[in-house]
């Protein structure tokens, strides 16, 4: 395998011409582990940073992430480390798969050491206190570093099982897009490019809201017609909100929008779907979260997006109904009722002029 640097990339690299980029994934959850495994399988010099030293040592010995992906064997070349400085020094790309509530703190910690030419967020969420997207946080904490976001319908267990999947790398830098495609693209995992960073990021964050709604609906055994309404009205809400945030609503027609929405809303593998199902089955939020044992970004996103939508005067009835059900004790039937409000609005709203949406 030839030695290779990030800055050597000047054009897309064919799948059969892999060279050894140095990749680090920060965060040992299911998706971070899946992306690290893909990079290692593609021949990249790959590390995964995990806070707990014992867990990192166990992964290096067994090549299994027992907590998140116990049924899959990882590439033997993938190295787990618990030292953050070691993880980020002299690397070409840092992929950050840290929950949104800890994202900024980890970037602050790596700032003195980072020598990477690109930092890419894998996190689908919004920072609670500031309503900042992960790309905003990267720009604030690492202002000199090229950045991007990776998002799409990427259920980790399906990727690990080798099922054909795709994702989107969004960045203002063509070089960052090429580098991430080079590191992760394979015969079974296609990486598309985009320059609409906020659009791709919004799709990844907002769809978590509606996965919670679909999980609640599944617990009530809703029909296919109702599921279709949830999906399409969710897409309308997402596009309305995206326009107010300066994103291109047409981005939501791609993998990072409707693709991710469909996968997350229809899969029992989705954490947000699972927590919704638990809530619909009569459990409290605390009980559901404890039972899941992982972070469900959708719950935090519901709170943040509802507040921002009220501030911006964006009509988001499903999001409002979810908030009322989860935090105010309203009956889950309110979610279904939210689909039937507001008379005869246009079906495909995001193709209308903005003042008509």
Curated annotation (Swiss-Prot):
Subcellular location as annotated: Cytoplasm
Main location: cytoplasm
Gene Ontology CC annotations of this record: cytosol
Annotated positions binding NADPH: 30-31, 51, 124, 156, 271, 297
Example GO BP: glycerol-3-phosphate catabolic process
Catalysed transformations (reactions): sn-glycerol 3-phosphate + NAD(+) = dihydroxyacetone phosphate + NADH + H(+); sn-glycerol 3-phosphate + NADP(+) = dihydroxyacetone phosphate + NADPH + H(+)
Active site, per annotation: 207 (proton acceptor)
A Pfam family the protein falls into: NAD_Gly3P_dh_C
Name this protein carries in UniProt: Glycerol-3-phosphate dehydrogenase [NAD(P)+]
GO MF annotation list: glycerol-3-phosphate dehydrogenase [NAD(P)+] activity; NAD binding
EC number(s) reported in the record: 1.1.1.94
Pathway this chain belongs to: Membrane lipid metabolism; glycerophospholipid metabolism
Enzyme class, spelled out: oxidoreductase
Chain sites annotated for binding sn-glycerol 3-phosphate: 124, 152, 207, 260, 270-272
Similarity remark: Belongs to the NAD-dependent glycerol-3-phosphate dehydrogenase family.
Function: Catalyzes the reduction of the glycolytic intermediate dihydroxyacetone phosphate (DHAP) to sn-glycerol 3-phosphate (G3P), the key precursor for phospholipid synthesis.
Keywords: Cytoplasm, Lipid biosynthesis, Lipid metabolism, NAD, NADP, Nucleotide-binding, Oxidoreductase, Phospholipid biosynthesis, Phospholipid metabolism
PROSITE patterns for the chain: NAD_G3PDH
Organism: Acinetobacter baumannii (strain SDF)
């Amino acid at each position: 395998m030839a030695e290779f640097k990030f800055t050597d990339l000047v054009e897309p690299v064919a799948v059969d011409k892999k060279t050894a980029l140095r990749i680090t994934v920060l965060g040992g959850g299911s998706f971070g582990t899946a992306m690290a495994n893909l990079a290692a399988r593609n021949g990249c010099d790959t590390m995964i940073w995990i806070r707990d030293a014992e867990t990192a040592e166990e992964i290096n010995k067994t090549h299994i992430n027992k907590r998140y992906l116990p049924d899959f064997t990882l590439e033997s070349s993938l190295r787990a480390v618990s030292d953050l400085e070691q993880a980020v020094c002299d690397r070409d790309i840092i992929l950050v798969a840290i929950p949104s509530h800890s994202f900024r703190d980890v970037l602050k910690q790596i700032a003195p050491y980072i020598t990477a030419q690109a930092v890419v967020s894998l996190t689908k969420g919004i920072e609670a206190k500031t309503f900042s997207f992960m790309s905003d946080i990267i720009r604030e904490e690492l202002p000199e570093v090229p950045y991007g976001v990776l998002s799409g319908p990427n259920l980790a267990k399906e990727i690990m099982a080798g099922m054909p999947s795709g994702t989107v790398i969004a960045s203002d830098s063509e070089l960052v897009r090429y580098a991430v495609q080079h590191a992760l693209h394979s015969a079974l995992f296609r990486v598309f490019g985009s320059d609409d960073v906020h659009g791709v990021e919004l799709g990844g964050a907002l769809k978590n809201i509606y996965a919670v709604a679909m999980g609640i609906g599944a617990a009530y055994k809703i029909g296919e017609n109702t599921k279709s309404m949830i999906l399409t009205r969710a897409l309308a809400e997402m596009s309305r909100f995206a326009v107010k945030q300066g994103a291109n609503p047409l981005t939501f027609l791609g993998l990072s929008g409707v693709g991710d929405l469909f996968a997350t809303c229809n899969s029992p593998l989705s954490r947000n779907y699972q927590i919704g199902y638990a809530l619909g089955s009569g459990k409290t939020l605390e009980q559901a979260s404890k039972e899941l044992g992982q972070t469900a970004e959708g719950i935090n996103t519901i709170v943040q997006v509802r507040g921002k939508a009220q501030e911006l005067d964006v009509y988001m009835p499903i999001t409002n109904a979810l908030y009322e059900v989860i935090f105010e004790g309203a009956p889950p039937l309110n979610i279904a009722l939210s689909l039937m409000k507001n008379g005869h609005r246009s079906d495909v709203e995001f193709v209308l002029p903005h003042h008509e949406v």
